[in-house]
Regions:
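Short, histidine-centered active-site or binding-site loop motifs used for metal coordination
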Residues: 4-6, 35-38
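Active-site beta->alpha N-cap acidic-glycine motif
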Residues: 1-28
């Protein structure tokens, strides 16, 4: 899943709208929302709604299909923000952490590892391969 920061992609040139559509249409990659500006925790409810629901709307308009996954900026969340993400129509949301997902995990606080543009595949494999 590629989690897209809707405004940053346009402003900072990470991916063009055409690139986002192309990877989505490939069927190999799902597109999820990562807010409009990568800010969230410091905002009040109205601005958080614009970030959470607005990013979903922007991406769904671009792609012409539902965006069902959300990733919290910096992996940070609260119970209040979790409720707002759920109310915005997402099916699941992710935070950062190596913990195992189990039956008591909430769909709106699933853990994933963070992969950035500076991470190399061999290093990730070494880091996350269980030790013998």
């Amino acid at each position: 899943t590629f989690f897209i920061i809707a405004d940053n992609n346009i402003l900072n040139g990470y991916m063009t709208n055409d690139m986002i559509k192309e990877v989505s249409e490939s069927g190999l990659v799902n597109i999820g929302s990562h807010t409009r500006s990568h800010m969230l925790m410091q905002y009040g409810k109205l601005r958080r709604d614009q970030e959470i629901a607005g990013s979903k709307f922007d991406l769904e308009t671009l792609l012409g299909k539902p965006v069902t996954a959300f990733a919290y900026p910096y992996g940070a969340m609260s119970k209040t923000i979790e409720k707002e993400v759920k109310a915005s129509g997402y099916d699941l949301a992710f935070r950062i952490g190596p913990e195992v997902i189990h039956t008591s995990s909430t769909r709106y606080g699933l853990r994933r590892i963070q992969v950035t543009q500076t991470d190399a595949i061999p290093g990730l494999i070494k880091t996350y391969t269980p030790k013998k």
